[in-house]
Amino acid sequence: MIEFEMAEHDYIELHSLLKVTGLCDSGGVAKLLIAEGLVHVDGEVETRKRCKIRAGQIVAFNDRRISVI
């Protein structure tokens, strides 16, 4: 599991999270994968590219999980 620390921000947009954690090569690829329903947030399919991810949430994609702290 990848741990992503929010630091000083309240949230990060879903497509940006996939990019900065290295699970996607670019934001464009991340947006496409999200739109195709391949990304889960807290166990539910998420299709909103700009979904606000906050501390305590779990994002899953391609058998990888990101814990946002």
Positions of PLM-derived features:
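A basic, amphipathic helix-loop patch mediating RNA/tRNA/ribosome contacts
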Residues: 12-52
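Short, Lys/Arg- and Gly-enriched loop/turn segments at beta-strand edges
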Residues: 65-69
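A detector for short, charged/polar N-terminal pre-domain segments
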Residues: 1-12
